[in-house]
């Protein structure tokens, strides 16, 4: 485990953020832009395809106007995020839910109601990530997959302190620990893009529900 994570829990202040203001205020402006480059976006889509994400019902956590799936999921897509305008612009979404997971980590869905839960380049903003991922485990069907993708890009004032304080390898360790503490076993992590100067790296972490 990386030094950013202690053996008996998270270091004091790990989940503090520079901007302690209401997240709802921060996300009021609709940002109809992508936050990673084209190669990183392609890597997200390829990973989803490899894991069969589009072959069932999908929940996209902390979503926006694009979900980076190569096609519309056969079982439908629920996009949950902070900005209604962004979510309603998502062409793949069958249902949108506006919810701040930092205020309420409980997902408004029945047990075992999704085949995949994904979260793209947003895990670093959660102040209760383990609780949210336990909820992801609850709503996943047996054999369903949770997929977290992340890069080195973020809104630094809203990312948690522990994330900003470590390097990319440390962030991989953090995400693995989030998943393991949420009860997922057999977690896989990988760098999904080639290391190239000036390009965004894309890391993935995924696991199947029991």
Language-model segments: residues:
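A short SAM/SAH-binding and catalytic strip from SAM-dependent methyltransferases
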Residues: 115-130
């Amino acid at each position: 485990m990386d030094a950013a994570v202690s053996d008996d829990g998270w270091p004091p202040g790990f989940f503090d953020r520079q901007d302690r203001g209401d997240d709802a205020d921060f996300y009021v402006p609709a940002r109809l832009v992508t936050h990673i480059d084209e190669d990183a976006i392609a890597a997200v889509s390829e990973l989803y395809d490899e894991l069969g994400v589009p072959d069932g019902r999908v929940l996209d956590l902390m979503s926006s106007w694009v979900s980076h799936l190569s096609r519309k999921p056969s079982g439908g897509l629920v996009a949950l995020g902070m900005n209604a305008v962004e979510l309603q612009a998502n062409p793949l979404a069958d249902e949108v839910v506006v919810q701040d997971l930092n205020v309420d980590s409980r997902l408004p869905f029945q047990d075992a109601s999704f085949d995949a839960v994904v979260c793209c380049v947003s895990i670093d903003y959660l102040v209760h990530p383990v609780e949210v991922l336990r909820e992801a485990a609850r709503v996943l069907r047996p054999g369903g997959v949770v997929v977290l993708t992340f890069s080195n890009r973020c809104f630094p004032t809203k990312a948690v302190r522990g994330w900003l304080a470590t390097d990319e390898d440390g962030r991989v360790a953090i995400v693995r620990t989030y998943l393991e503490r949420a009860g997922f076993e057999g977690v896989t992590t990988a760098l999904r893009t080639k290391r190239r100067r000036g390009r965004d790296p894309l890391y993935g972490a995924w696991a199947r529900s029991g």
